[in-house]
From Swiss-Prot:
High-level lineage: Archaea, Methanobacteriati, Methanobacteriota, Stenosarchaea group, Halobacteria
Assembly mode: Homodimer.
Binding residues for NADP(+): G124, A125, G126, G127, A128, A210, G233
GO molecular function list: NADP binding; shikimate 3-dehydrogenase (NADP+) activity
Biological process terms in GO annotation: amino acid biosynthetic process; aromatic amino acid family biosynthetic process; chorismate biosynthetic process; shikimate metabolic process
Name used for this protein in its record: Shikimate dehydrogenase (NADP(+))
This protein's encoding gene: aroE
Keyword vocabulary terms for this entry: Amino-acid biosynthesis, Aromatic amino acid biosynthesis, NADP, Oxidoreductase
Family: Belongs to the shikimate dehydrogenase family.
Role of this protein: Involved in the biosynthesis of the chorismate, which leads to the biosynthesis of aromatic amino acids. Catalyzes the reversible NADPH linked reduction of 3-dehydroshikimate (DHSA) to yield shikimate (SA).
Any Pfam family: Shikimate_dh_N
InterPro entries assigned to the protein according to its UniProt record, in alphabetical order: Aminoacid_DH-like_N_sf (IPR046346), NAD(P)-bd_dom_sf (IPR036291), SDH_C (IPR041121), Shikimate_DH (IPR011342), Shikimate_DH-bd_N (IPR013708), Shikimate_DH_fam (IPR022893), Shikm_DH/Glu-tRNA_Rdtase (IPR006151)
NCBIfam families in UniProt: aroE, PRK00258.3-3
Residues at the active site: K65 (proton acceptor)
């Protein structure tokens, strides 16, 4: 039996176990997905321990994505993002990847949204915001970053060759935008809040909200009312998981089965 897993703290809320279990069942794999919850400063030791125990692959979630990038060798994209959310132990040494980047790209592709040449705005410069910004820039979009802390927006904009804008400038920045990614926790605890005023949204936008609980956020409701294409955060979660599965197994991910398992729990 192959063992895969997730490290984070906490991990009890994670939807990765049912997501991956559905993939293993659909593909007839003798595999199991488990969770590990090391102390906040023990990421490197936990990764080494997982490898020593014969774990085939790990997903990494908060607060360990950045420390994991320092604990293992990474591919070029994970190095640029500065965060690892997937580790493969199949080689001579563990190797880290950031499948959140692919999760963003594949979520837009699923909804027939082209990112090449897009005018994109990303709200948030944390882990999800960084992955989104790199995904958009790598796909050929022009990227503007808005964040509560301007220094973080400036840093991320410089990293992706984009532009930082103030949160107060969002309506003006969105006027000619074709893509909006929201990558903060706004709307998670209070589903009636939104990071963007409804009157700044329009029907030329494709809006991805990285929040997936609730699935339908205030931002997505307002965007739909404005005629925009809406993409909930469960699509990003689904496709980052599919990308990890494909890296570990070399098989095409059974996306439909994984999506059904995910939606059943949302």
């Amino acid at each position: 039996m192959d063992v895969y897993g997730l490290i984070g703290n906490p991990v009890g809320h994670s939807l990765s176990p049912p997501l991956h279990a559905a993939a293993y069942d659909e593909c007839g794999l003798d595999a199991r997905y488990v969770t590990f919850e090391p102390a906040p400063d023990d990421a490197a030791a936990a990764i080494r321990g997982a490898g020593a125990l014969g774990v085939a692959g790990l997903n990494v979630t908060a607060p360990f994505k950045q420390s994991a990038a320092s604990a293992v060798a990474t591919d070029s994209m994970a190095a640029r993002v500065g965060a690892v959310n997937t580790i493969d132990f199949s080689g001579a040494a563990p190797r880290g990847y950031n499948t959140d980047v692919a999760g963003v790209k594949r979520a837009f592709a699923h909804h027939d949204v082209s990112l090449s040449g897009a005018q994109a705005v990303v709200v948030g410069a944390g882990g999800a915001g960084r992955a989104a910004a790199f995904a958009l820039a790598d796909a050929g979009a022009t990227v503007r970053i808005a964040n509560r802390t301007r220094a973080a927006a400036d840093e991320l904009a410089a990293d992706v060759g984009g532009t930082a804008v103030g949160l107060g400038d969002l309506p003006r920045s969105l006027a000619d935008a074709t893509v909006l990614v929201h990558a903060t926790t706004v709307g998670m605890d209070d589903p009636d809040t939104s990071p963007v005023s409804a009157d700044a949204l329009h029907d030329d936008l494709a809006v991805l909200d990285a929040v997936y609980s609730p699935v339908e956020t205030r931002l997505l409701r307002d965007a739909a009312a404005a005629g925009a294409t809406t993409i909930d955060g469960a699509w990003m979660l689904l496709y980052q998981g599919a990308e990890a599965f494909e890296r570990w197994t070399g098989l095409d991910a059974p996306v439909a089965a994984m999506r059904a398992a995910l939606r059943a729990r949302l």
